[in-house]
């Protein structure tokens, strides 16, 4: 997910994207804790995407 794509979205769309990413992170965490997640790098990618979305939301809220 690119930052330019995120900046083009509205705050409502970003909040929906954030909720989806948080659900995805939860699912990956559960899979990792039960030993079912083979691609552990996905946790890091999702965590960083969450940070990106939160940063863009904060930037838009400040304007």
From Swiss-Prot:
Q: Which GO terms describe its biological process?
A: translation
CDD domains for this protein? Ribosomal_L29_HIP (cd00427)
Q: Which GO terms describe its cellular component?
A: cytosolic large ribosomal subunit
Keyword Ribosomal protein annotated? yes
Q: Which domain of life is it from?
A: Bacteria
InterPro entries linked to this entry? Ribosomal_protein_uL29, Ribosomal_uL29, Ribosomal_uL29_CS, Ribosomal_uL29_sf
Q: Which Pfam families match?
A: Ribosomal_L29
Task: Please give the SUPFAM superfamilies that the UniProt record associates with this protein.
Answer: Ribosomal protein L29 (L29p) (SSF46561)
Task: Please provide, alphabetically and separated by semicolons, the GO molecular function terms listed in this UniProt record.
Answer: structural constituent of ribosome
For this UniProt record, the keywords arranged alphabetically read as follows: Ribonucleoprotein, Ribosomal protein
Task: Report the sequence similarity comment from the record.
Answer: Belongs to the universal ribosomal protein uL29 family.
> Protein name, please?
Large ribosomal subunit protein uL29
- Native species: Colwellia psychrerythraea (strain 34H / ATCC BAA-681)
Per the record, the gene is rpmC
């Amino acid at each position: 997910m690119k930052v330019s794509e995120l900046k083009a979205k509205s705050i409502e769309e970003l909040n929906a994207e954030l909720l989806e990413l948080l659900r995805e992170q939860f699912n990956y965490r559960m899979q990792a804790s039960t030993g079912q997640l083979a691609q552990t790098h996905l946790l890091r990618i999702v965590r960083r995407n969450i940070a990106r979305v939160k940063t863009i939301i904060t930037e838009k809220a400040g304007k």
